[in-house]
């Protein structure tokens, strides 16, 4: 079977990680291609037999070129879809999904579109309008959260709840144990939605002994990095800013706790990856699916959005009680089978067969 994925870029994001993981898993038995909009190389390793196609690049430096190049890119996408005959197209992320629906007009190949953020994350009124207008014309839509499934079923005929696979499921034995260090992690883009400021303020509200005895690391890059470094200094907290990192595994192996501070999420990769490394997860009750991944006080902890005091109290609770932390991560490991690549791959193939035979 010929399967073609479409995505804007293969940078270090969570959705990009998922696409590469799926492509690598499917290419062992199927012919897999990836069409991407941007010229940059894939941040994640692709198997050699995955065909990578980059659309023609256009200028975006002036208003005229921004408008003209969007139209040219749409035509380039349509041309690529025509030239790469496939049994199914699978597009990732909202604006790419919209572009693919319009670019596929008149083509018979079924299109599955895949959402990787909560529906509320898309703020632009124009893009929300285009999403509402175009999504009914896809052949199927995959979503990550139960609330998103309910939302999209109002206007999309076939909506499937498909969790993200975790590439660590083939690398890490669930019987494996890790020598932990006094390390607390924040991993993610440094932007307003991920709210890393909350992490810094929570550290500042910790017991002083804990601040001295633990290392706090921010792994990720983005528009707020410089501001956050100044913020850490002004709060008087010691935080290491590592920037974008390739070997996140080494951090998970050492870390005792991971903090997620987002306002809006789909199915956060870090809350899944950390399961395999016995990292205790503390997350905001982000809009609108934290309960899909964490049962509060059983296999992790939930706190209110932007509530740094609550985050600090949960951190103190876990960091002062190692047995509690171990109990939490033991319970959390039970979720790992939900994200095994073989399990998710099977679900994707079932959905592909469904749209092909519809």
Annotate each language-model stretch with its function:
Residues 5-13, 17-21, 25-65, 151-153, ...:
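N-terminal strand-loop element at the rim of the active site
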Residues 91-97, 115:
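Short His-centered aromatic/hydrophobic patch
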Residues 244, 263:
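Aromatic "clamp/platform" in nucleotide-sugar-dependent glycosyltransferases that forms part
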Residues 296-297, 301-308, 317-322:
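Conserved acidic donor-binding segment of nucleotide-sugar-dependent glycosyltransferases
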Residues 147, 165:
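Carbohydrate-associated surface elements
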Residues 310, 317, 324-338, 350:
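A short, well-ordered alpha-helix in the C-terminal region of glycosyltransferases
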Residues 16-21, 98, 182, 186-205, ...:
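A conserved mid-protein helix/loop that constitutes part of the nucleotide-sugar donor-binding site
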Residues 280-284:
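Short hydrophobic beta-strand element within catalytic cores of glycosyltransferases
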